[in-house]
Swiss-Prot record:
Subunit structure as annotated in this protein's UniProt entry: Interacts with MAPK8IP2.
This protein's encoding gene: Mapk13
The protein's name in its UniProt record: Mitogen-activated protein kinase 13
Pfam families in the cross-refs: Pkinase (PF00069)
Family: Belongs to the protein kinase superfamily. CMGC Ser/Thr protein kinase family. MAP kinase subfamily.
Regulation: Activated by phosphorylation on threonine and tyrosine by dual specificity kinases, MAP2K3/MKK3, MAP2K6/MKK6, MAP2K4/MKK4 and MAP2K7/MKK7. Activation by ultraviolet radiation, hyperosmotic shock, anisomycin or by TNF-alpha is mediated by MAP2K3/MKK3. Inhibited by dual specificity phosphatase DUSP1.
Molecular function GO terms recorded: ATP binding; MAP kinase activity; protein serine kinase activity; protein serine/threonine kinase activity
Co-factor requirement: Mg(2+)
Enzyme class, spelled out: transferase
Source organism superkingdom: Eukaryota
UniProt keyword list: ATP-binding, Cell cycle, Kinase, Nucleotide-binding, Phosphoprotein, Serine/threonine-protein kinase, Stress response, Transcription, Transcription regulation, Transferase
Organism per entry: Rattus norvegicus
Length: 366
């Protein structure tokens, strides 16, 4: 039985995958694919702008996949900040829940990501501008009650004008390994997330910003651990082995005795670690790469750092109007129930004009 599809759609094979697109999106071209779906670029004929369209990979294969698809859709719908990727449109070619198998997320198109350009030389001015945007995006995400947990160069999208948007926020859950067998990059992850050794809060993302900023300034990954223990060893070489006050906060007994077994060592001199960085950049790194989560800067505190004085526009440092509501995710729903919720969200979606900054830095990526 052939499925009934909506009118105004056309089919196209993109990178050996069947896509269905509304006729408003022209010239689709493959951009990339990953564990959770594939992305193509297209031109929105109504605006002439290039967009990115993501087709989720088998969103209704299981309850876990369906729940993750629902979360991704809701997170994107919730975001309205120039430094956070948000939703321009969402569509399905299906005409009812009964024949609903696929849906597509339409987002702003960004030329590249930081991972792909980490080898280039960044001036401190460029690092400053990119880190300022990361922190603005994080302040907004955190104000919605979301923690990224897996911030790394690969999910920081940038365009040729050095404008940055955070991707894949709030999706780094325990389901990742279950769904893909994929082990997340630990190099940018805060020690409390890697080791689950103490409570963690939104400053896990600030640690990641510190690691990324350090790499942009030096051209080298700061903590390149081969495994979890090696990662901790690399971190402690820089932060020093903490004293009794810190050890008391550790919940994990094994971590506690391991740290206590190490000879105490002082924190490295960050001016020697980052010899080409300005004193202000060194001071910010020192405060972001703080082992104790209770002493590490928040995104709002980091934005107020003197390093960003020349750039700051508090009007752009906005917060979410309301917290992200994930109450439904605590329910154990069937695939069909998740499908109904997603279909309803798509049917009720109304695009909101994206609010991007009016100012231009005049800076080019390369």
């Amino acid at each position: 039985m052939s499925l009934i599809r909506k009118r105004g759609f056309y089919k196209q094979d993109i990178n050996k995958t069947a896509w269905e697109l509304p006729k408003t999106y022209l010239a689709p071209a493959h951009v990339g694919s990953g564990a959770y779906g594939a992305v193509c670029s297209a031109i929105d004929k109504r605006t002439g702008e290039k967009v990115a369209i993501k087709k989720l990979s088998r969103p209704f294969q299981s309850e876990i996949f369906a729940k993750r698809a629902y979360r991704e859709l809701l997170l994107l719908k919730h975001m309205h900040h120039e430094n956070v990727i948000g939703l321009l449109d969402v569509y399905t070619p299906a005409t009812s829940v009964r024949n609903f198998q696929d849906f597509y997320l339409v987002m702003p198109f960004m030329q590249t990501d930081l991972q792909k350009i980490m080898g280039m030389e960044f001036s401190e001015e460029k690092v400053q501008y990119l880190v300022y945007q990361m922190l603005k995006g994080l302040k907004y995400i955190h104000s919605a009650g979301i923690v990224h947990r897996d911030l790394k160069p690969g999910n920081l999208a940038v365009n040729e004008d050095c404008e940055l948007k955070i991707l894949d926020f709030g999706l780094a859950r325990h389901t990742d390994a279950e769904m893909t067998g994929y082990v997340v990059t630990r190099w940018y992850r805060a020690p409390e997330v890697i080791l689950s050794w103490m409570h963690y809060n939104q400053t896990v993302d600030i640690w990641s910003v510190g690691c990324i900023m350090a790499e942009m300034l030096t051209g080298k990954t700061l903590f390149k651990g081969k495994d979890y223990l090696d990662q901790l060893t690399q971190i402690l070489k820089v932060t020093g082995v903490p004293g009794a006050e810190f050890v008391q906060k550790l919940k994990d007994k094994a971590a506690k005795s391991y740290i206590q077994s190490l000879p105490q060592s002082p924190k490295k001199d960050f001016t020697q670690l980052f010899p080409r960085a300005s004193p202000q950049a060194v001071d910010l790194l020192d405060k972001m790469l703080e082992l104790d989560v209770d002493k590490r800067l928040t995104a709002a505190q980091a934005l107020a750092h003197p390093l960003f004085e020349p750039l700051r526009d508090p009007e752009e440092e906005t917060e979410a109007q309301q917290p992200f509501d994930d109450a439904l995710e605590r329910e154990n729903l069937s695939v069909d129930e998740w499908k109904q919720h997603i279909y309803k969200e798509i049917a009720n979606f109304s695009p909101i004009a994206r609010k991007d900054s009016r100012r231009r830095s005049g800076m080019k990526l390369q």
